[in-house]
């Protein structure tokens, strides 16, 4: 059992610690700078292979287009949490390389989901560039590319962690999280099929289930849980305590995402929102349904889930009319207070700063 050696020093997401901008940038550069090594690990041996060399060359292109370019919050969280939780005997260079590799496993995991999700949502841009499937010559071949990104996760885990006592824990964690995320995606798809608009399915309970499974497990619990296993924190109680905080944080994050999809600046978010056109069970439409008059509900029925720009505009006008901007601001304040209460209640033997740093990182974000 891990003795929690060295967990008293304060931890926050790299951008939030009281460090100089130079140090913050160095930590990010260290993580981003490890990516070429990940690409080499995954492609170097296969690129010249007489049988599969062409396919591995394609994998290299897929990796370089889809894995970098994001904020890297999930991957950076693994590394920062590992540094905070690890004892003196766990801070050697090789152990830190393992943490960097596991961080990149989560970024590859994210890329796998996003490539597939963009196809299903018929999205146009991602991280300020064309979605991979929209690139000339890619199209639906991107489905197989997403599979390659997923299998890359397990190849990296094997290379860096196979000899480590936590290897099986990480394998099971990634496999379970993939299943949970895919269940969440399925809930999302069957709740709001593109071909049929039925707002009666858009309940708060269903929305919370979609968010928990589709976003919260892999975006918040997975990075922290991975770091916990890597330092030997494997008790069910500690993981349940962390999960109670992190799943709530994931819900908060997704509600922000839904708000930014409609009201955010694409120049900041890097993507053009499509939730209204895609008939998504988003926080905005669920809350709007609780506020509308019968006439306004009919307007929503007639215009939600339609591709025409004028119909999308009518939904946005309705959101303004029923006060969704103010409703979100009120939610953001109350949810942040609730998160702080949960952290106080559940962080027990884990340092509160891990959770407070994550919460502060996403509070009032614009992208």
UniProtKB/Swiss-Prot annotation:
Q: How is the cofactor bound?
A: Binds 2 Mg(2+) ions per subunit.
Q: Which biological process terms from the Gene Ontology are attached to this UniProt entry?
A: cholesterol biosynthetic process; farnesyl diphosphate biosynthetic process; geranyl diphosphate biosynthetic process
The question of whether ATP-binding is a record keyword is answered with: no
Q: Write out the residues that bind Mg(2+) 1.
A: 117, 121
The pathway that the record names for this protein is: Isoprenoid biosynthesis; farnesyl diphosphate biosynthesis; farnesyl diphosphate from geranyl diphosphate and isopentenyl diphosphate: step 1/1; Isoprenoid biosynthesis; geranyl diphosphate biosynthesis; geranyl diphosphate from dimethylallyl diphosphate and isopentenyl diphosphate: step 1/1
Q: Where in the cell is it found?
A: Cytoplasm
User: Kind of enzyme, top EC level?
Assistant: transferase
| GO molecular function terms attached to this record | (2E,6E)-farnesyl diphosphate synthase activity; dimethylallyltranstransferase activity; metal ion binding
Q: Which Pfam families match?
A: polyprenyl_synt (PF00348)
Binding annotation for dimethylallyl diphosphate: 126, 214-215, 254, 271, 280
Q: Pinpoint the site Important for determining product chain length.
A: 112-113
Catalytic activity, per the record? isopentenyl diphosphate + dimethylallyl diphosphate = (2E)-geranyl diphosphate + diphosphate; isopentenyl diphosphate + (2E)-geranyl diphosphate = (2E,6E)-farnesyl diphosphate + diphosphate
Report residues binding Mg(2+) 2.
Answer: 117, 121
Instruction: Name the cofactor(s) required for activity, per the record.
Output: Mg(2+)
Q: Binding of isopentenyl diphosphate: at which residues?
A: 71, 74, 110, 127
Q: Name one GO cellular component term.
A: cytoplasm
Instruction: State the EC number(s).
Output: 2.5.1.10, 2.5.1.1
Per the record, the domain of life is Eukaryota
| UniProt similarity note | Belongs to the FPP/GGPP synthase family.
Assembly notes: Homodimer.
Physiological role: Catalyzes the sequential condensation of isopentenyl pyrophosphate with the allylic pyrophosphates, dimethylallyl pyrophosphate, and then with the resultant geranylpyrophosphate to the ultimate product farnesyl pyrophosphate.
What protein am I looking at? Answer: Farnesyl pyrophosphate synthase
Q: What is the lineage of its organism?
A: Eukaryota, Metazoa, Chordata, Craniata, Vertebrata
In the UniProt record, the gene name given for this protein reads FDPS
